[in-house]
């Protein structure tokens, strides 16, 4: 008798998408994704696993009317381990119990001027199963997106991007101060706000390049 188990993904910690305008309606789309390299599986999309298999990192670009304009895959550039927070008071007891890896992806696309602009969307399931303030986090996916404004807003634009990585762990009961600053190549003023993370796909369908349901994740108090 052969028994099969669905290859679920329980690894996503976070991510961001940003872009640079190259001229001639060409944009370099960049994405960083973070995974738990202790409690989570599988490896990053776009990179080979231990058997040489590669799951493509699909993304889709939509116009403001939800029409898919480009469906493609990111080029996997590099991945590395995020250094731990060595100056944390609980670092000696936490060392070896926390591990986060960062993957970098890029893709150059041509996007003609379009009123309203475009949305670049990447979806993947699932989030880290150790999350405490989500119901069944190991079956909750993630959606990351970036908006490229249309010509009625600006003729050419580069998006902001975060400057510092957040610490991979914080100490229970100890306040944290972290400078989550971003920079903008155009020198634009930046406004920061907190929002609900977006859900995306589930354990039954962990990866697909279709119209993404950008819905906030269901939360519970803890």
Model-derived features: where do they sit?
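Long, compositionally biased, intrinsically disordered segments
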Residues: 7-222
């Amino acid at each position: 008798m052969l028994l099969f188990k669905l290859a679920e993904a329980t690894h996503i910690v976070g991510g961001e998408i940003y872009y640079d305008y190259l001229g001639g309606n060409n944009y370099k789309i960049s994405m960083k994704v973070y995974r738990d390299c202790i409690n989570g599986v599988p490896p990053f999309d776009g990179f080979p696993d231990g058997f040489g298999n590669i799951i493509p990192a699909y993304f889709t670009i939509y116009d403001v009317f939800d029409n898919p304009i480009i469906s493609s895959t990111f080029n996997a550039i590099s991945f590395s381990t995020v250094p731990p927070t060595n100056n944390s008071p609980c670092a000696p007891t936490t060392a070896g119990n926390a591990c986060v890896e960062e993957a970098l992806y890029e893709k150059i696309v041509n996007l003609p001027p379009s009123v309203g602009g475009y949305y670049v969307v990447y979806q993947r399931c699932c989030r880290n199963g150790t999350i405490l303030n989500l119901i069944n986090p190991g079956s909750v996916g993630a959606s990351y997106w970036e908006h490229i404004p249309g010509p009625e807003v600006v003729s050419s634009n580069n998006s902001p991007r975060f400057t510092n990585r957040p610490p991979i762990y914080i100490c229970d009961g100890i306040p944290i101060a972290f400078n989550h600053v971003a920079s903008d190549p155009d020198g634009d003023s930046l406004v920061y706000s907190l929002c609900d993370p977006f859900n995306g796909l589930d354990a039954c369908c962990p990866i697909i390049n279709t119209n993404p349901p950008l819905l906030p994740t269901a939360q519970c108090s803890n």
